Amino acid sequence: MSAATDQILEQLKSLSLLEASELVKQIEEAFGVSAAAPVGGMVMAAAAAAPAEAAEEKTEFDVILEEVPADKKIAVLKVVRTITGLGLKEAKELVESTPKAIKEATGKDDAEAIKKQIEEAGGKAAVK
């Protein structure tokens, strides 16, 4: 790879989920393409690969914010901002649009710690 592509790749790795989503939308608009998964053959290939993956031990987990009681929204919002590094507006949108992934592809211990922080703040989270 060239130095330019390496640099772009490193910048992409540092994006938050919200920033990555915004980037995808901008690319779709700029180039007139769609990031939607093709239907048909890919679905069949994914279904065939699923049993083989099930045999392997899962090492990456997603933390999903499932529910936030109205009286606990501020406390959960603070925890979400700490975990994700999002700004106030982005974190508020994430908290208000549950269920939503807060952290993806993280280790089991980290995922459990994040879930515990959210639950201590009054929210409901799941590790998947």
UniProtKB/Swiss-Prot annotation:
Gene encoding it? Answer: rplL
Q: Which PANTHER family match?
A: 39S RIBOSOMAL PROTEIN L12 (PTHR45987), LARGE RIBOSOMAL SUBUNIT PROTEIN BL12M (PTHR45987:SF4)
Which family does the entry's similarity section mention? Belongs to the bacterial ribosomal protein bL12 family.
Q: Which GO terms describe its molecular function?
A: mRNA binding; structural constituent of ribosome
One GO cellular-component annotation of the UniProt record comes to: cytosolic large ribosomal subunit
Native organism: Synechocystis sp. (strain ATCC 27184 / PCC 6803 / Kazusa)
Q: What does this protein do?
A: Forms part of the ribosomal stalk which helps the ribosome interact with GTP-bound translation factors. Is thus essential for accurate translation.
Task: Fill in the subunit field for this protein.
Answer: Homodimer. Part of the ribosomal stalk of the 50S ribosomal subunit. Forms a multimeric L10(L12)X complex, where L10 forms an elongated spine to which 2 to 4 L12 dimers bind in a sequential fashion. Binds GTP-bound translation factors.
UniProt protein name: Large ribosomal subunit protein bL12
Protein keywords: Ribonucleoprotein, Ribosomal protein
Ribonucleoprotein is among the record's keywords: yes
**GO BP terms, alphabetized:** translation
